[in-house]
């Protein structure tokens, strides 16, 4: 694998509609409640946010929130987090379609995902003030939900360069790298810095993958730098 394969220029992702805007008002009640929950977490965290707070920001009644999420706060915040992850991954996937090599796809994906995590008010509030709330997201079940969503959205892009099984592996490794450095930060490693993201992505994802593929039969090994035919 050559040292450099270019990069993908990513535009800022469209922010989620904010409460009080026409775009927000045009959404369904469920969509407003999910977005309102994320807004509340970004301001007050999970512990201090009540269902009444979410209802007020969403512009609906408390009864509506409970009708949509009868199991209360745990169900609401779990659903809000999953919806937010799905929204961000879909937008990220659209922008990564311009990647011409696996290197560009992985490096740009890791860098962008880390940057988005750092810019999320809700996630940063939890990491700074309620780490005990953020910690369960590292559990096997919660992490698998995130990984499954990432594979569903991003693996088709990686399949341009490698076989489907390897594509899933690449996406999962990338997601794990971002999750690890987001929830267990290393003061010396900032994935929001593109050069650092490139170094980490190549060290922990691309180089091990290249070694694995090199150990396979030559006739079955696709190039990491060219689309598969």
Predicted regions: what they are:
Residues 89, 125, 133-172:
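Amphipathic alpha-helical packing segments from all-alpha helical-bundle domains
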Residues 94, 103-128:
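Helical hydrophobic small-molecule/effector-binding pocket
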